[in-house]
Amino acid sequence: MPVALEISDGVARLRLNRPEASNGMNVELLKTLHEAVLAIHADPAARVVLLTGEGRNFCAGGDVKTFEAKGEKLPDYLREATAWLQLATAALIQLKAPVVTAVQGFAAGGGGLGLVCSSDLVVAGRSAKFFSGAVRVGMAPDGGSSVTLTQLVGLRQALRILLTNPTLTAEEALQIGLVTEVVDDDELTEHAESLAADLAALPADALSATKRLVWSGVGQSVEQRLAEEARTVSELSGTPDALEGLRAVIERRVPRFSR
């Protein structure tokens, strides 16, 4: 299964499970992720969620090999993938249970960055890296990152990250408020598990109410802004520049965008 879910001791352990593809997101993974989040929502035993990625990287974003294989059907596939990613990230925010995410390696693209931004607490390994990259391949940010990233780091930092596409270190991510804390790589799993266990021991209703109050107090509803983001991504997904950007990634070359 591309996503694994196990609930015990009040903690729902949700794991992206495509390590051979750096947990790159395709429609199958995104559908399964959304279904898993809905299962967590329906299970009162899940008081806290611990989100992780199997292997060296948390999530490398979209699965570019799958995208290339779609050929002329790529725009439709990207629209479908974006829709499922939007559903998954929105469902994480809407969960009553707080979401703790542990990041190792790369959290990239709308998938990786979107999941980080939809989490409540994020623990990063010291060597972790964060990267958007959408503009570099002729696309707009997705996964809710145009909404939630701005809420987390502010307008100026969000524009810098999304327009200039820097690769942020874990320490840089901590300084701007993208992650909650940074720990040594070999302590990441244990620390994230401990944090989740500590939260699971607290009153579930108080955790849920606090999460709801914070997320609902950040201005225009996430749902409204996600809808606008999805529309923009859909418009760009079939453009020549978007297709050229993807081909350039596959062929490991500099893209030749139209001017």
What are these regions (language model features)?
Residues 19, 123-129, 179-227, 234-235, ...:
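C-terminal long alpha-helix characteristic of the crotonase
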